[in-house]
Amino acid sequence: MTSEVVIRKAVSTDMDAMIELLRLLFAIETDFVFDGERQRLGLASLLQMKNTACILVAERSRQVIGMCTAQLLVSTAEGGIKAIIEDVAVREGCRGQGIGTQLLTAMEEWAVKHKAKRLDLLADRRNELALDFYQQLGWQETELICLQKKL
């Protein structure tokens, strides 16, 4: 019998486990190159942004097995706050057990608590398993695309 999964806010001691999850995620997402130090800096910044960002982790038997990040932004289209979700990752041997669903449900609750009117989610268009998963949870593709410019 597998032990219960707990969804909770990440803390600094989760850093190494979260970096490992990002390493696995970035192996799939070809737009990004894994650089553990850069990811550590990014996660540390998110952990400090307590009012406008959230990192949730899924933990089983004291092991972090999944994560999800979100940040609040102002949407002129919505006339208020929206949340953008990134970095949804579940350890490979733990997929298909509802952990991703629990993470996204908890992140939606966090966004509602912070008065968000809409959620946006970034996903790799080639990751068909993830796209199917998101669509099963009610996420819909839009006509918008994400453009990027390095500074």
Residue ranges and their predicted role:
Residues 47-56, 84:
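A short helix-loop-beta-strand connector motif used in the catalytic cores of GNAT acetyltransferases and
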Residues 101, 113, 125-143:
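Conserved active-site alpha-helix within GNAT-family acetyltransferase domains
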Residues 6-18:
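A short beta-loop-alpha structural element at the N-terminal edge
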Residues 74-85, 95, 142:
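A conserved beta-turn-beta hairpin within the catalytic core of GNAT-like acetyltransferases
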